[in-house]
Every structure is written in C-alpha cells, then in structure tokens.
C-alpha cells in the first residue's frame, strides 16, 4: 500500500478546493477562450469551442454570474473579454460594458460551440483565429489547468494535465488509511477550509434573514419555508438550498469548491458549520470535519470521475456523513457505515446538468447525510448485498463505477440532447 505523503495530500486539497465564482464548467470554457485571446494578443475574429457531452450537459442551462445570461457561447464570449489571470473568478471580472460586448460577440456569431462525443468527463478545447494567427487551448481532466497550448501549429506550452494531481492516486490506499492520514494533517494547513465555509454560510444567512434579495425564486422559497425556530435538518436544508439556487442563478459570490465543485463545497460548508454549532464543536474540530468531507468526496470521485453521470450530491453527501459521524465521535467503522447509508440511499441520483434545481438535490443530500451520520453512530448500518451496498466501501464504489461507466455510460450524451428530445415529443 503506497501512502501519499502529507505535502502531496495538502497540494491535492488546494488543487480541488479553490475559490470559484459561477458554475465551474462555464468557467472552464471561459478560461479556454481567455487563454486564446491572451496568446493571440488581440480579440479573435472567430472562436470554435468543443466540449465533452458532460461539460455541455453541465454548462448549457446554468446562470452566468451577474449577467442574467446562460449558455456556453456567452461564457466563451465573456472569457474573450476577461483577464485569464483571474482564474476561476474571471466571469465576475467583467464590467457591465464588457458584458454587453460579450452579448454582441454572440449575436454576431464570433463564437461557435460543439460537442465532441468521443471525449468524456472534463474536456474543453478552444480554437481561436485572428487575421494573422491561430491559437488552440485544451483543458483535459481539470477545470483550470491547461493541458495543451498551440500557436500557429506549434506547441506553445501546457502540460497542465501532467501537473494536475490525479484523484486516482488516493486509491493506492484503503479509506481507513486515508482517514488516519487526513486526521494527522496540521489544522493550520487546513484552516482555509473553515474560512471558505464561513464565507459561504454568511452569504446564505444574509438571504435567509432578509438582508439580501435573492435572484432565484427557489431561494425565495427556501427563505420562506419554516423561517423561524428551524431544527438542524431544516436549517441545513434551507441554507444549502438558498446558496446553491443563488449560485446556479448567477449570483456573483465566491465559493470554495470541493473536488472541483462549488455546489459540493456549499454542501460541505453549510452542513458542517451548522452541525458544528449544534454540537458545540470548536473551530479546529469543524476544520478537521471539513477536511474529512473534502478528502472523502475526492476518494469516492476517484472511482467515478469528477464529472460523471452520478450526481455529485451523492459523493459529497457521503463525505458530509463521514464528517458528521466523526464529530459525533463515531468509530472508523461507523464512519464507513455512514457513507454506505448515503450511497445506498442516493446512489441512483443522476446528474442532469447544472441549473437552479440542483438546490433540491443538494439540500436533500445534506439532510440525508446528517441523518446517516447520526444513524451510523447509533449502530445502524446497511448489510452487504442490500441493493448496491457491498461488504466493504471499496466494493460498493466498484459497483457504482460499473453501473455509471458501463450501464449508464452514454447517459451524458442523451441528457445533453434534452432540448432536442423535448422538441420531438
């Protein structure tokens, strides 16, 4: 068993827990477009964007920060006008005038978008042409690291794919070994998780308490629902629902991602800060719980892929369940049992793309994760052979991987054609 050293674990955590504004798939496309303009040194006359079915599915109906707009063409057009050095915050770096310029670029047909059916998971490619030059940018396996750059047919850099630490490296050890390593990490190096979580919760509370008007009707619903004297579960449901609905509607607030996902970052942050308050856990304990949730999610995604037909609320929820159980002083086996309960409960929830109704899935997963943590600490577990649940956590995840990569391997393609399928009925 080859254990990763502590510094590699910290590097992996920082890679996957990064601040983003807006859904990370449109951000990925915007970064590709921004990099092409940076390479050309001028605004291109034409940009061709190609993405995997999974990226298309996730990016086609989600709100773009501060614009009221949706779609990959608009995301790419915004990227052409945004500073690439802003990283995953670039969509919020545009002025209102630049947003209007981006709309003009879309109307004039400067940006073309297509799907590469042969590509899976996280993949985006931008080909931009000026009057004199052509720039090509690829991102593969990462929302933010450029895997290849070409200028006028010559390699101009990249190799970000090689620099990108792979989640699969976590599978060199079993989950129990990973958990021990995570708990041995210095809380000082993990504290950024706590700070990021506090920022998310502060934003959600502002809307919940009426200090900020929501963009999303769904967020308004969560604000109105049982707005006084909520139980822990109801409060977690409402605040996760508010934060996700607002983010998907295009709110310009920064979110610390979890395994590259902002919504899963919200799931971990809100659930564990509120549970920590309920249990009177100190900042260090909550920080460690957040680290457990993040690394657990990464471990499970090493089986399924970061962007797959499996809804991220499932693995993210399992991570929260593990962390809740740890806060309740559960044993390692009980922590695994909590994860198995979530997987047995939610494993058939599919990802049908990023949109405001993700708030329903995330808020449901948050409540079920908290329940699973408490259930496991009370001695409840799912027996092996109960549905998809295996004897060991790793057995369960191998079966989940087979179901989603084999049996449901083409589902992203069909879900990406939802508009077409609806129009033919």
UniProtKB/Swiss-Prot annotation:
What InterPro entries does the database record attribute to this sequence?
Ser_deHydtase-like_asu (IPR005130), UPF0597 (IPR021144)
In its UniProt record, which GO terms are filed under biological process?
A: L-cysteine catabolic process to pyruvate
- One term of GO molecular function: L-cysteine desulfhydrase activity
Per its UniProt entry, which superkingdom is the organism in?
Answer: Bacteria
Which Pfam families does the annotation name?
SDH_alpha
Q: Which family does it belong to?
A: Belongs to the UPF0597 family.
Which named protein is this? UPF0597 protein Moth_1414
